[in-house]
Design a protein with these regions (language model features):
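Membrane-embedded transmembrane alpha-helical bundles that form the catalytic cores
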Residues: 1-240
C-alpha cells in the first residue's frame, strides 16, 4: 500500500480522525500500535511475523547490550542483532540472485541440475524497519541511547506506518521521547492528554499535499524514463 494510493489516504484519514477524537495518550499508544500492525498485516499477511521478530530481537538485545559489563559481550550481542536482521533482509532480497549465480557456476562445472528460484515476495518496509532497529542497537552499543523500558513504545517506533513504506528511517533517540514528552510551560506529563495545535496541523497537511504533488507530477512521470536507462546502462553516458 503506497502512500499515494487511495487506500492509504483513506486508512490515514481514518486513523487521524480517531486520533483527534479520543485524546487520551495511553489510548493513542495502543491505537498507533494496532494501526501499525494492521497496516503490515493488510500489506503482507503472515509476513508480519518478520516485523514482530525484529521488534522482539532488538528490544531484548538492546537491554542486554546496555547491561553488559564487557566490550566482548556487547560486541557479541550487537553481532547477534546484525546477523538476525540482515540475515532476514538478505534472504528475502537476494536469495534468487544467489541462486542465479550458483546456477551459472553449475553450468561451468557441468552440473546437470539447477536450483529453482524461490520467487519470494519482498515484505513491505523490511529494509526500513531492519535498518531502523539496527540503528537502535548500534546507538545503545555506542552509549548514545538508553534502551526503552516499554516494549509497547519500542513496537510503535518500529511499526510506525506513515513512514515505513517510503522512509525516512527514524532514529529512536528522536522518536521515542515524543511518546512521553512534557508540556514545558505547565511542567506536567502529556501522558494522559494530548492537544492538536491548528498551526502544526495545517503545516503538516500542506507538507503532505506538496509531497503528493511532487510524487504524482514529477517522480511518477520521470520514473519510466529513468527505469529504462537503468535497465540497459551499457553504452550510455552521464549526458545521454
Amino acid at each position: 500500500m503506497l502512500f499515494n494510493t487511495i487506500e492509504f489516504v483513506i486508512f490515514f484519514i481514518s486513523i487521524l480522525s480517531i486520533f483527534i477524537i479520543f485524546k487520551n495518550r495511553k489510548f493513542h499508544h495502543y491505537f498507533l500500535l494496532v494501526a501499525g500492525f494492521l497496516f503490515f498485516y493488510w500489506s503482507n499477511n503472515y509476513l508480519i511475523t518478520l516485523l514482530i521478530f525484529s521488534i522482539l530481537l532488538d528490544f531484548y538485545v538492546g537491554k542486554e547490550i546496555f547491561k553488559a559489563k564487557t566490550i566482548t559481550r556487547k560486541k557479541s550481542l550487537l553481532i547477534l542483532s546484525l546477523v538476525g536482521n540482515l540475515g532476514l533482509l538478505g534472504f528475502f532480497k537476494y536469495s534468487d540472485f544467489a541462486i542465479a549465480q550458483f546456477n551459472i557456476l553449475g553450468n561451468y562445472i557441468n552440473l546437470t541440475d539447477s536450483i529453482p528460484f524461490l520467487n519470494l515476495a519482498l515484505p513491505i518496509g523490511i529494509s526500513f524497519y531492519t535498518f531502523q532497529t539496527i540503528s537502535y542497537t548500534v546507538d545503545i552499543y555506542r552509549g548514545q541511547l538508553k534502551p526503552s523500558n516499554s516494549l509497547r513504545e519500542f513496537a510503535i517506533f518500529v511499526a510506525f506506518f506513515p513512514q515505513i513504506v517510503a522512509g525516512p528511517i527514524l532514529r529512536a533517540k528522536d522518536f521515542l521521547p515524543q511518546l512521553n514528552e512534557k508540556m514545558e510551560k505547565l511542567k506536567i506529563s502529556k501522558l494522559r492528554l494530548i492537544t492538536l495545535e491548528k498551526t502544526s496541523f495545517r503545516i503538516g497537511v500542506a507538507m503532505m499535499a506538496l509531497g503528493f504533488f511532487k510524487k504524482m507530477f514529477f517522480a511518477d512521470n520521470i520514473a519510466p524514463m529513468v527505469n529504462d536507462i537503468f535497465a540497459m546502462p551499457v553504452g550510455l553516458e552521464s549526458f545521454t
